[in-house]
Structure formats: C-alpha cells, structure tokens
Design a protein with these regions (language model features):
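Short helix-capping/hinge SLiMs at alpha-helix to coil transitions
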Residues: 40-44
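Short alpha-helical segments that sit at the start of domains
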Residues: 8-37
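Amphipathic alpha-helical dimerization/coiled-coil segments
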Residues: 19, 103-123
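Short, cationic-aromatic polyanion-contact patches
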Residues: 83-106
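C-terminal regulatory/oligomerization modules of transcriptional regulators
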Residues: 1-6, 122-123
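Short acidic, hydrophobic short linear motifs in intrinsically disordered regions
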Residues: 45-55
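Short amphipathic alpha-helical interaction segments
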Residues: 59-74
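A short, conserved structural fragment
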Residues: 73-83
Length: 123
C-alpha cells in the first residue's frame, strides 16, 4: 500500500515540474488550478457565478478563480462562450486540448489505482 501511495505522490510531484507542455504546466502549477480544472471537468460548462458558488471561498477566492479562468482561456486550456440568452453571462469549459491533458493524466494513474484496489482485496 505504501508503494502505491509513493507512486501517486511521485507522479504528482513530477507533474508539477516544468514540462515542455504549457497546458500540463498550467494544470499542475498550483492546487487551485487543479481544483478548478477538476471542477470544470465534472461539468459540461459553468458560469463564473456557478463556479464561485460551488467552490468555497476558503478554498479558492473569487478573484483567484477569475485569474485562473483568464489565464487558462488565454493558453487555450479552457474555452469561454457567451450565453445566447444573456450576453453578460459567460460559460467556461475545458477545451479539447485541456480535456486531453486531464484524460492522459487520469489514464496514467489507472495502474496506481488498480493496484490500490487489488491490494485492498488481498488484505
């Protein structure tokens, strides 16, 4: 069990190290970026208000959320689209490239988590 957690820890630390891929760097540059990205990945799309309502301000402040969305949109990790019914509201979602980075990371963790499942059965 310790080895499995060590592998997950090592992968998270290595993911945070600078890579050639700016999208991967963005995802793991801070815990707030990672939390916001996983929140958006759990939704098809969300407005700033929805995000701020569902992520407590003690976890990520509104201004930090705005900055992460702005930076992520600039590097094409997120996409921003206008609400056709209310031009003031903007929807944010993962871009295809952002989604691919997240899926690749999750698939790389598949072995670790399947080992975790197997070790709990053996116990």
């Amino acid at each position: 069990m310790e080895q499995i957690f060590k592998n997950i820890y090592t992968d998270l630390v290595n993911s945070k190290n600078k890579s050639d891929n700016p999208l991967k760097n963005f995802l793991f540059s801070s815990m707030t970026n990672t939390i916001l990205t996983f929140y958006l990945a759990s939704k098809k799309k969300a407005t700033l208000e929805e995000i701020c309502y569902n992520i407590p301000p003690k976890i990520i402040s509104r201004s930090t959320i705005q900055n992460i969305l702005k930076e992520g949109t600039k590097i094409l990790f997120f996409e921003k689209e206008l609400n056709p019914n209310d031009k003031r509201a903007k929807y944010y979602k993962l871009s295809n490239q952002g989604n691919k980075i997240l899926e690749d990371w999750a698939l790389s963790q598949k072995n670790n988590f399947s080992e975790l499942k197997n070790s709990s059965k053996a116990a």
